[in-house]
């Protein structure tokens, strides 16, 4: 097996870095700073980060087929025009829950944008329970709710045959699997795939590799773990030099690099001194596996 190398490629510290997405056309990495209320784009060739500020906490960003990006921010699905930095609301959710905000999201293989909500954090990973839901934004901008009673809606991705949705509600400390109808975008038969061990931390963002295995970033666990959905077993752990790992995606010219976002929110001065690059973006190479290109929102 090739030797694994971990490096901090963006040392600017973000409060809650999240939602990394590789944009192949530009050769750049998109990500958000949730409470910093920014959409960011890092160019590996220049090592520079460009960012656009938005007016609400932003949980996730995705590519959009017609250009620009689609966002799950505040209680809205919105579109971002990167060139003029304008944001347009496409749909609203949870209007009866003013304390809720969107969190993680991802586009399914048919071009629908799924994202979930949670109540605003009292402090990191502490929320009013059962306030969140998982939603789909369809290309015609209609919205459907999959289920509610969620604590912190988080990582999601699809099996390589597109028949299974993998999903994380962080405070359940589990990775779940659901049957997924790719024709309709409906999900059913939710079940537990993997329960995290105590030392692994809180399951956060997630992505799938080209071998159909899941990679889960573990908040406060300082690691990404690889899970085999066939057996429900954890088969690999990659530890990072920071505790607050938040999400992961594959990228680079051939999708052989893994990018991991992190947070520094809630860390005291002593903790920050010990881990000064918390809130940075990390690149992991030498994993010996490649990822899958992200799908763009079709609407």
UniProtKB/Swiss-Prot annotation:
Protein name (record): Regucalcin
Family to which the UniProt record says this protein belongs: Belongs to the SMP-30/CGR1 family.
GO cellular component, one term: nucleus
Protein's GO biological process: intracellular calcium ion homeostasis; L-ascorbic acid biosynthetic process; positive regulation of ATP-dependent activity; regulation of calcium-mediated signaling
Location of the active site: 204 (proton donor/acceptor)
Major site of localization recorded for this protein: cytoplasm
Entry keyword annotation includes Cytoplasm: yes
Binding site for substrate: 101, 103, 121
GO MF annotation: an example: enzyme regulator activity
Enzyme class: hydrolase
InterPro entries found in the cross-reference section: 6-blade_b-propeller_TolB-like, Regucalcin, SGL, SMP-30
Gene3D superfamilies with a match to the protein in the record: TolB, C-terminal domain
Record has Hydrolase as a keyword: yes
Co-factor binding details: Binds 1 divalent metal cation per subunit. Most active with Zn(2+) and Mn(2+) ions. The physiological cofactor is most likely Ca(2+) or Mg(2+).
Tissue specificity as recorded in UniProt: Expressed in the liver, and in the pronephros from the late tadpole stage.
Binding locations of a divalent metal cation: 18, 154, 204
Catalytic activity: D-glucono-1,5-lactone + H2O = D-gluconate + H(+)
Involved pathway(s): Cofactor biosynthesis; L-ascorbate biosynthesis via UDP-alpha-D-glucuronate pathway; L-ascorbate from UDP-alpha-D-glucuronate: step 3/4
EC code(s) of this entry: 3.1.1.17
Species of provenance: Xenopus laevis (African clawed frog)
Pfam families reported in the protein's UniProt record: SGL
């Amino acid at each position: 097996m090739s030797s694994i190398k971990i490096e901090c490629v963006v040392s600017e510290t973000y409060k809650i870095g999240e939602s990394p997405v590789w944009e192949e056309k530009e050769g750049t990495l998109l990500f958000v700073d949730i409470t910093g209320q920014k959409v960011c784009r890092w160019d590996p060739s220049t090592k520079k980060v460009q960012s656009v500020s938005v007016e609400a906490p932003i949980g996730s960003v995705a590519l959009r087929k017609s250009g620009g990006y689609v966002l799950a921010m505040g209680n809205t699905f919105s579109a971002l025009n990167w060139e003029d930095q304008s944001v347009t609301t496409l749909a609203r959710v949870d209007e009866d829950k003013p304390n809720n905000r969107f969190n993680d999201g991802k586009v399914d293989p048919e071009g629908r944008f799924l994202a979930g909500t949670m109540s605003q954090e009292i402090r990191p990973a502490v929320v009013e329970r059962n306030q969140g839901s998982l939603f789909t934004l369809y290309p015609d901008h209609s919205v459907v709710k999959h289920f509610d009673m969620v604590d912190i809606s988080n990582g999601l991705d699809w099996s390589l045959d597109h028949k299974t949705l993998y999903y994380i509600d962080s405070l359940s400390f589990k990775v779940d699997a659901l049957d997924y109808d790719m024709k309709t975008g409906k999900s059913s038969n939710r079940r537990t795939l993997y329960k995290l061990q105590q030392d692994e931390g809180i399951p956060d963002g997630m992505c799938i590799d080209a071998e159909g295995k899941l990679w889960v970033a573990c908040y406060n666990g300082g690691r990404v773990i690889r899970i085999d959905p066939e057996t429900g077993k954890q088969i690999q752990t990659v530890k990072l030099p920071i505790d607050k790992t938040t999400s992961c995606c594959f990228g680079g010219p051939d999708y052989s690099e893994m990018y991991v976002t992190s947070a520094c929110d809630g860390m005291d001065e002593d903790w920050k001194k010990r881990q000064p690059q918390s809130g940075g973006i990390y690149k992991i190479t030498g994993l010996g596996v490649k990822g899958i290109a992200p799908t763009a929102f079709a609407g």
